[in-house]
Amino acid sequence: MSASSQPVLVADIGGTNARFALADTSLDAPLQQDSIREYAVAEFPSLGDAARHHLEQIGATASRGVFAVAGRVDGDEARITNHPWVISRSRTAAMLGFDELHLINDFAAQAMAISLLQSDDVVQVGGAAWVPGKPGQPRNYAVIGPGTGLGVGGLILRHGRCYPLETEGGHVSFPPGTPEEIRILEILSEQFGRVSNERLICGPGLVNIHRAVCEMAGIDPGQLQPVDVTARALHGDPQAMRTVDVFCAVFGAIAGDLVLTQGAWDGVFLTGGLTPKMLDSLQHSGFRQRFEHKGRFSSIMARVPSLAVMHPHAGLLGAAAYAADAERDAPGVAA
């Protein structure tokens, strides 16, 4: 069996969890469902150890891999933004006995997944109806998603090929759009100095917003986790409800700015671990109002679809799409 016909080990590595699967890149639905596993990254000293453990658990071997990591990839090295792992591509490949290993940014993988998503993998959160593009159609998409941090990327489709945009856009400065948000920025600046979008739009960001909302109300916020904030909001707690409202509005404003920055008129995909959990809030909040409220471009923005990705393993799917694209670039393979 040739290397290109063997399953590829794909991974989606975040600051909290590591997900692995085998993928058959010849298929439109490449993930082998019975091979998908999730592990806590804190349980392993390195990515190589986690990958080797996974292969042992499923009783499989692989000679190639595509690992999507939540951090910047710089040549041979990647650093997980919210975890102390420092990953060397060459050392990890040698540890696993791989002939080929690609390290890509996790939101490059989220972007690549768009090329394999179907209509039932997404839920519309406003804008014109989205129809998956036909092969060869040019498309520009943005991708943004809150989880442990805030990931930002994009995808350009040209001539049947996918070109992901790897960015660290979650770390751009937070631009408040209301007097309340200006006050939130002031409060968070006292703790963090510079305040990035990720300080608000992610799991820990919910807690940060809640603390600021409580401070403005003269209320002790307590020691809460993100899940506590959303649970309190569901039970009618005023500060928690306001926190969710602010979160959704700011998320919409940032997503709209991303569309303008990238020229992503074909749509923005909302991914990350929080998006499915907060879907109802996003659909019944100021998300789209702030998304569309872009001055002279408001009428154009009203047509841009925003789509919540509901596929449970979009990062793995995108890593598989990247592997398939890499195979087309391999020597001796016709484009």
Curated annotation (Swiss-Prot):
A family per Pfam: Glucokinase
Keywords, comma-separated and alphabetical: ATP-binding, Cytoplasm, Glycolysis, Kinase, Nucleotide-binding, Transferase
Cystines in this chain: none
Binding site for ATP: 11-16
A biological process from GO: glycolytic process
EC number assigned by the record: 2.7.1.2
CDD domains: ASKHA_NBD_GLK
GO cellular component, one term: cytosol
Predominant location: cytoplasm
Catalytic reaction annotation: D-glucose + ATP = D-glucose 6-phosphate + ADP + H(+)
NCBIfam families according to UniProt: glk, PRK12408.1
Family stated for the protein in its record: Belongs to the bacterial glucokinase family.
PANTHER family given in the database record: GLUCOKINASE (PTHR47690:SF1)
Protein name: Glucokinase
